[in-house]
């Protein structure tokens, strides 16, 4: 059998489809069709059943999450579905009652963590942006935060990640200041990123000093991770669930769409929606903008590492960081 790493992308997907079929034997489903859906760090397959139901099977990337973090995701989703009317991506229990399958098949290296989700209707909110939708998004995030705050102490087995520094993924290579990447990062760019990292890490230290207020947050709530269907919002992709603070979730949401001409209007609608149900987090825009800058640095480093032609992205994002320091430095 040809080694997995020597296969074409199509060949690797054929192998992974065999893994999916093996995982699906743990569910009480009569499978009609399994087809590749997308790869966005994780690999997704669509599953159609004979009775007409649709599902998505997610194969987690080892680079992005751990089993314990996946367990935290399932814990919160299960609680949200049990306790609230918030519409979220719904994981499906296996025949043994658990959510997560750790599977392996010949020809695919290692073990793969997999979860089956019910199909989420509608289209990405990114395709339907409006002040009304962003008002709803603000309310939805406020409801998520209310629920997280009301949860009892987390079980000892639940260990979400924490966004307590700029580079918070434990195994993430930091490359922007290394010799191998000097052609992308001249000294002034390195100094710029260093300055932002220092300022952001000061804020992270201040936030996480308040241990009593830490709670589960979504960690990646933006207009690509929300579907709009018949006027209602469905929140998906809780993979980045973390122990943190509402301010961090707000910053993630507001970090998207900043080049749009209607960004200020969308931002105001989001703030109004959130504030209609819950006190707005943070004391100033400076805190939100610092968290947005921290996320920008993380993405600059990530894109430099994985994109064969990252120069334009790096330059554009560095310009944003310069504007941040000018306005809030």
Spans of model-derived segments:
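Juxta-kinase regulatory segment immediately upstream of eukaryotic protein kinase catalytic domains
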Residues: 1-31
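Active-site acidic catalytic loop and adjacent metal/ATP-binding pocket
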Residues: 40-49, 56-57, 91, 147, ...
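Protein kinase glycine-rich loop
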Residues: 35-38
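A cross-family kinase active-site recognition segment
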Residues: 127-188
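ATP/Mg2+ or Mg2+-diphosphate-binding catalytic cores
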Residues: 2-7, 298-329
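A glycine-centered beta->alpha junction motif in the catalytic cores
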Residues: 62, 97, 110, 114-127, ...
